Curated annotation (Swiss-Prot):
GO terms for molecular function: methylated histone binding; zinc ion binding. The gene is SET4. CDD domains: SET_SpSET3-like. This is SET domain-containing protein 4. Residues 26-38 have a biased composition (Low complexity). GO terms for cellular component: Rpd3L-Expanded complex; Set3 complex. A zinc finger (PHD-type) spans 160-210. Residues 346-475 form the SET domain. SUPFAM superfamilies: FYVE/PHD zinc finger, SET domain.
Length: 560
């Protein structure tokens, strides 16, 4: 049988103390209604023993000692429990053994310690306290650093100057944002006045090469251009300064012609002339260039005419689907099989055109009908993407912008506004002398994975004289009413008013970007007809309005 001491110590370890009696009281049992002891009705109500019950007990040593509250969770012990327990314990210690009393005292102390430890945690070590203090300090410092002040918000909202002029000064300047690349440009650099309203569809010069800029405000900028595996070139000393050095220049060209043709050529070092001086020379002097000077001349002309341009030797694809389309149709009926190579192309000249506003491509030597002249390089994409882009104004113009050509048979177009070759400066004419054809070289192998199996080459449709400007036809949309003027099926006066007014607005928009290469000299030029009709119509409209106003004034004065 288990001794009373072992039972008492076991109950003390469990958090509650009981003394042994004839019937051992368990933690879960409660006193019955016939018992002489009262129930525990509250969390802090101690069990009491009545006087009647104390008389029936055989001996005080079998009376239960005051127990702790049987709470579901551990907690601090009330102070009056310690006092009552101390008094009861002293009362029974006189009649009981000293050994049992000391054991019960140790049990009470252990129970108090367990109850206190359940609610009051032990103190942390010194190292842990230091770590926690460091974490709190770091958190406070980071919160101060991450705090956004009004001045910082103003700095974030400040427009980022990405103007083509290259100036980083944004103080007291008016900006306009590009709708494509989201950069801020100076309004003065694009010939906008301070009072002019802001255009929502504004596109900067980098995104659209046709955007007009105010040259006086633009600082010269030099952009690196990728030339494939070849070295970087910059054209220099190619402009003929006077008639005295013309023979020397021709002699140098002849010397280069006698040398074996190689992929990598050596040119003179870049000069220190800025774009303004080069642009002035290009206006006044003639550029005589052979095929060996195509790339350096292209870089020089591009730096004086565009803000950013990449000269390429192989056409690029917009995506992989364009290349798949060409690979699946490279053997169509209109694809010309020839042993033509781009290195043996005809020589061309690039100089100012007759209107003194645009560059033009001229034949350096005479060409016969059917001769392949030069490859038209650029970025190849589907025509639908060009037509649906609102920045191209295709619905208003009814044709492509300069430096863009539609393929005559495939639903593709070649865009040389950002990448291309010298042929990008070719102009359109109502009397063209070249056409765009698709050539499949027989001997030339692809120069890379991105190299096309076919080439888009300009072919002469008639004999071309030396020095004659090379031009392609206007690629009018099939629904454009200008076809009725071209085919002479209708006159401008007989056209419906919607078509008439649309043609007037379309030709006005086209003439702001480029001119017809015929120079308005031909009587059959549809652009010349529409331009003259538009000017006459506006003049008559102003006269009629002025006459109507004058008539109204007379009638007003004649009233009684």
């Amino acid at each position: 049988m288990t001794s009373p001491e072992s039972l008492s110590s076991r109950h003390i370890r469990q958090g509650r103390t009981y003394t042994t009696t004839d019937k051992v009281i368990s933690r879960s049992s409660s006193y019955s209604s016939n018992s002489s002891m009262s129930k525990d009705y509250g969390d802090h109500t101690p069990l009491s023993v009545s006087s009647a019950a104390s008389e029936t007990l055989p001996s005080p040593q079998y009376m239960p000692i005051r127990t702790f509250n049987t709470m579901p969770t551990a907690g601090p012990t009330p102070l009056h429990l310690f006092q009552n327990d101390r008094g009861i314990f002293n009362h029974h210690s006189s009649s009981g053994s000293s050994k049992t009393a000391s054991t019960n005292k140790r049990g009470i102390a252990a129970a108090v310690a367990l109850a206190t430890a359940a609610t009051i945690p032990f103190p942390l070590k010194k190292q842990n306290q230091d770590d926690n203090s460091k974490v709190s300090v770091t958190h406070n410092e980071s919160s101060k650093e991450n705090k956004i002040t009004p001045s910082m918000r103003a700095e974030d909202n400040k427009p980022k100057n990405g103007c083509i002029c290259g100036s980083s000064d944004s103080k007291d300047e008016l900006f306009i944002q590009c709708n494509k690349c989201k950069t801020w440009q100076h309004k003065l650099c694009y010939a906008f006045k301070k009072s002019d309203p802001i255009k929502r569809d504004f596109v900067c010069k980098r995104c659209d090469s046709d955007t007009k800029v105010q040259v006086n405000q633009v600082k010269p900028m030099i952009f690196p251009r990728k030339m494939g595996d070849e070295r970087l070139f910059q054209f220099s000393s190619i402009v003929t300064t006077s008639a005295s050095n013309t023979n020397q220049h021709q002699q140098s060209v002849n010397n280069i012609e006698e040398q074996p043709k190689k992929r990598q050529l050596h040119y003179t070092a870049p000069t220190t002339e800025n774009s303004n001086s080069i642009r002035k020379k290009l206006r006044q002097e003639k550029l005589v260039v052979s095929s060996h000077f195509l790339k350096p001349l292209l870089n020089e002309v591009s730096s004086s005419n565009d803000t950013e341009f990449k000269a390429i030797t192989i056409s690029e694809y917009k995506d992989k689907y364009v290349k798949m389309f060409i690979d699946n149709h490279y053997d169509d009926d209109w694809v010309v099989c020839s042993n033509w190579e781009s290195s043996r192309s005809a020589d061309i000249e690039v100089r100012k055109s007759s209107n003194e506003r645009d560059f033009g491509v001229f034949a350096a030597d005479s060409c016969v009908k059917g001769e392949l002249i030069q490859e038209y390089l650029g970025k190849i994409d589907f025509q639908k993407n060009y037509q649906t882009d609102p920045n191209n104004d295709y619905r208003l113009m009814g044709t492509t912008k300069p430096k863009v050509l539609f393929h005559p048979h495939w639903p593709l177009y070649i865009d040389s506004r950002e990448t291309g070759g010298l042929t990008r400066y070719i102009r359109r004419s109502c009397e063209p002398n070249v056409e765009l054809v698709t050539v499949r070289p027989l001997d030339e192998k692809p120069r890379g994975d991105n190299d096309c199996r076919v080439k888009f080459v300009l072919r002469a449709i008639r004999d071309i004289r030396k020095g004659e400007e090379i031009s392609v036809e206007w690629q009018w949309d099939l629904r454009n009413p200008i076809w009725e003027i071209i085919n002479a099926s209708k006159d401008l006066d007989s056209l419906p008013d919607p078509d008439k007014f649309w043609l007037m607005g379309s030709i006005k928009t086209i003439l702001t970007n480029c001119d017809c290469a015929c120079g308005y000299l031909g009587h059959n030029c549809p652009i010349t007809k529409i331009k003259n009709f538009s000017e006459e119509f506006m003049r008559n409209t102003k006269e009629s309005l002025s006459n109507k106003s004058y008539f109204n004034t007379i009638m007003h004065n004649c009233k009684p």
